[in-house]
Amino acid sequence: MKFLIAIKNTKKESKNILEIGCKIAEGFSADLTICYIGKQSKALIEGDVNLARKTLSEWNIHHPGLEVLEWAFNILKEKGFAPNSDFDVDNLVEEKGRIRMVLSKTTNYQIGLVLREGDLLSELNKEVKHSDFDIVIMGSPHRKRMINKISQFLDTSIFFVKNFNPNWNYKILLCVDDSRATKRAVILSTRISKQFDAEITSLTVSKTSLFGKGYRNAHIWAERYLQRIGIPFNSKLVSGNPVEVFVNEAGEDHIIIMGKAKGNEFLKFIWGSKPIHTAQRANCPVLLVN
C-alpha cells in the first residue's frame, strides 16, 4: 500500500499528524510519502532552478517547504523510517509541477519527500493521481466546506487528523451501514486496531427503529469478520440521527472509521453526506474509506 501524509508547517499539529501517520503506515508496511504544498513561488513558475548548484540555505530562501520536509524527515528517522538515509539537496529531482527527493530503500517500504506549490486541493489531487495513493493523511481543515471538497474530489481514502493526542489510548468506532465501502472499512479497522492495541465498537445506526435488510446484513458481516480475525470488539444497533450518534459515541478518544457514501456526486457536493458531516462535526480523527 501507499500512504501520503500532507503537512503544512513544523508546528505541534503537524508533528501529531506525522505521529499517527507513521504508526498506521507501519502496521501496513506501506510506502510513505510526505508532501508539503506551499504558495507558488516565482522561481518554480519560471523553472529558474538548478538543483546541482543550489546549497541548502539557498533552497530554503526560495523554497521554505524544504525546511518543513527536512524537519519531517528527521522525525521519520526518529521513528525508525529510512534509518540510513540523509536529507541531501543533491538528491532533489525536479519533475513537472513537483520536486521530490530520491531516497534509498533501506527497509521493506519506500520513503518519499515531495514539494508542490499552488492550490491545496488541486495539488493534492495531482499528487494522488500521480502516485495512486491508498490513503491520504492530513489535518482536518477548519472550514467545513473544505472537508466536503477534499472528501468529494480526492478519489482515495482520507484520514482527517483532528485533536490527536499521541499519549491517549485510542479506541476504534467502526460505523457500519450498507454502503459499498463498508467492507473495506471493516478490513482496514482491524489492521489499525492491532497497531493501536485498540478495542473496536461496531456501530450501525438507523434513523428509525426498523433496520433494513442491507443494514442488518452489513452489521452481521462485520461481526463475523471481526470474530474471525480475533479482534476484541462490541457491537451495537442504535436508532437515532446517525451523525449525532457517531459524534457523541466517539467523543475525543476514538478513531472513527467509516466508508465513503454512495450516491449522486453532485448532490453530495451540495448537501454533503453522512460520512462528510461526521468528519465535519467529530472531535477526533476520522478515516473515510474509499
Please place each PLM-identified region on the residue numbering:
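Small/aliphatic-rich secondary-structure junction motif
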Residues: 1-62, 170-236
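Gly/Ser-rich helix-loop-strand patches that form or flank binding pockets
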Residues: 13, 18-20, 25, 113-166, ...
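Aromatic/hydrophobic pocket-lining residues that form π-stacking "cages" and hydrophobic walls in ligand
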Residues: 21, 72, 124, 189, ...
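Short secondary-structure capping/turn micro-motifs that flank functional sites
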Residues: 41-42, 92-93, 144, 167, ...
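Structural beta-alpha unit
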Residues: 59, 74-136, 228-266, 284
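N-terminal membrane-insertion helices
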Residues: 61, 65-76, 219
